[in-house]
């Protein structure tokens, strides 16, 4: 959050807003202290039902979506590091993403980092029956967990992970709610390593310019 606060301070006077949404089943209890400690001056919300992840097909954090003043997505879900605290693990330098973000804020739809509709369609993940069923299974697991039935919740969390194996959010949240080794026979780090390490866990954002700068309309 400190990284986002620094970005907000730098860009807030240029018609730029940040809405951060913590995806946390335990809500204020777990996410609240982090927000309080960060003292953000941008909008910080907590999503106990993981609705944002469901609606935007987000599978990991930190994930950013760029939305313009007309409510149109101009860049879809992608890894969004705004500082280098986790660079040793992720292997990602935050500078290219930050430069692209600043370029968009400055130039709007003329920014070379705004995606064309064709490219957006290629990048957007379309819901299929497995993804939809995974969300339903995860929601049922959350309901059972909050009702005090963790043992009954675990099979539904497992089903969500099986149906949507790309969702690290499902793994991260489920493992945090119980003893992962005991209930799932694995740990989060084990799963990252099994998938191929940090490069698979954090695929770099596609910051290739959409068009040549001179091709943008004046």
Regions found by a protein language model. Give the residues of each.
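Thiol-/selenol-based redox modules, centered on thioredoxin-like
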Residues: 68-149, 178
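Structural microenvironment flanking redox-active thiols in thiol-disulfide oxidoreductases
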Residues: 1-37, 48
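Alpha-helical linker/edge segments of TPR/alpha-solenoid repeat scaffolds
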Residues: 177-205, 218
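Short, internal strand/loop/helix patches
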Residues: 32-61, 65-67
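Short coil turns that delineate tetratricopeptide repeat
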Residues: 131, 163-165
């Amino acid at each position: 959050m400190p990284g986002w606060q620094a970005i907000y301070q730098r860009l807030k006077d240029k018609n730029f807003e940040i809405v951060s949404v913590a995806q946390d089943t335990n809500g204020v209890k777990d996410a609240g202290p982090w927000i309080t400690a960060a003292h953000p001056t941008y909008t910080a919300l907590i999503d106990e039902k993981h609705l944002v992840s469901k609606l935007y097909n987000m599978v990991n954090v930190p994930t950013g979506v760029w939305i313009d003043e007309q409510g149109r997505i101009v860049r879809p879900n992608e890894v969004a590091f705004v500082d280098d605290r986790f660079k040793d693990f992720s292997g990602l330098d935050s500078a290219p993403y930050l430069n692209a973000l600043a370029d968009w804020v400055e130039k709007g739809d003329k920014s070379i980092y705004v995606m064309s509709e064709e490219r957006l369609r290629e990048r957007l993940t379309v819901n299929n029956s497995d993804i939809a069923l995974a969300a339903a299974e995860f929601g049922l697991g959350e309901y059972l967990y909050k009702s005090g039935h963790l043992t009954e919740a675990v099979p539904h969390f497992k089903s969500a992970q099986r149906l949507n194996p790309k969702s690290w959010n499902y793994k991260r949240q489920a493992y945090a709610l119980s003893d992962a080794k005991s209930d799932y026979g694995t740990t989060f780090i084990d799963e990252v390593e099994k998938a191929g390490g940090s490069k698979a866990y954090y695929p770099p954002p596609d910051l290739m310019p959409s068009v040549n700068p001179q091709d943008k309309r004046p």
